[in-house]
Amino acid sequence: VFLKIMLAQKERRKLKFFRLFEELPNGEYTVKKISELLSYSYTSTQKILNEMEAEFQDFFQEDFSLLTELGTVQLVPTNLNYDTYYNYLIHRSIPYRAIICSLTEPDKDLLSFCKENFLSRASAMRQLQALADYVQEFDLLFNRSQLTFKGDERLIRITLFNFIWAASRGTEKSLNVLAKQPIDEALLFLQHEIPLLQDYVGRREIHLFAEIMYQRIRQGYYVVDDTRYEEAKFSENQRVKTTLVEHLAIPPEHLDAEFHFIQFMMFYAPTFQFPEDVRIAQMPSFSGHGQVLMPLLYKLDNYWAAEILPGDTSFPDNKVVHGNLFNVLFCYYIFPKRIPTLFLLMSYFRRKQTTCYKYLKGKYSVFLKKMSRRKDLQWLTTCYEDLADLFAWLTLDIFEEHQFREKLQVALVMESNYLFSQEIKGFLKDLSFIELIPFSPEHLPKTDFLITSSAMLIPEENHLPYVVFNFFDGETNYEKLYANLKRNYRKKCYANMAHNTDESQTS
């Protein structure tokens, strides 16, 4: 999602070209060969290579030429890597420059922006359309003609933070108005409430958010307060409020709302990493009279033991997972329609939806939909699917760890010669999910997988999966063996999971 918003199709193709350059063996390649490897036409390949050649001059000046005098392509030197080129394209992109412009030059309209970036108004409008469409999902409006955002100020700041952080990781030079030291001083007294301040990357995140906050306040945009923040019992530290007024120029009438929103941002993402996090000890206090989120989590504990992992009562002991579940719930409690998160901009998770993930998401959907019928939880109606998705990812590891305790039973069907078996036994010993057992045709029902030196050694009645390691022709592909073992291990675990689920439903 992030790349499709930030980069035009041609720029995304350039990244594919660069990735190919990193994978190819050293040497020179014809334009035709590159076009064939990427399945692009010769003409479009030539055009993209010419543009990349011009861009690389920003890195190499006259020291390197992508296209040789003979018209061949030589690979990029190793001192320019994919990540550097990726960041280069992102920072040059029109959507990213428009976002930065909206913060640092609020008086600049689209025509001035186009003149500065040497592009037509029509081209700019077209390149900014994906950004406008994306923010509209959260009831925000991005006015492309004025380069301004309208809507809930809290969601605007979160959206700006997401894009700028994903693009710059806090290194955007134009957002360095505030000296870092005053920000640290202003937030020093919130060290317990904001553990991110004790983390190297966390401090960068906070500094970036403070810069965005400062720029928006400077333009006259303020957040509104929200009584629902009481679910997390925010601090009212007057000393911190005073330093915020001094360093961020917050008018007194907006101070409480801005201070509360700063604290909300500590719950904006699943930021719990360690059981020692001081906020974990505070969580039981969130279940007082009138509060709904912690009681909902307690109900989830019971549901886990009854429906998700029948009989497992250890789920409440995982404080880090519970802290992150609370954070996610809290975000959607405040913004039930949908909240823009970095998670939604990532494509990584969309490609790794395992059977366990789908099982968990289905279970959470049933639970949250049922809970949404209660009067104090009707806000779940609009967001239970999003929550089920996040809950599934947050609990996937502990669920799989529990499911995958049983090992894959592997037997060797090969000559009784230690020279044959010692290497493969050593390989299997390093795999934590494998248990090597003696082979016997009578024990086939207790065996999951066979490794043999010849298919001729496999018993006729065998129905188990197997791999042949023929030592005489050198067919000993350990990578292929590992992938095969892992695939069968997961298949066994999923079968056990389905069996246990059926048993719990019939009992």
Identify the residue ranges that each predicted region occupies:
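A cross-family "folded-core" feature that marks the main globular domain of proteins
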Residues: 2-507
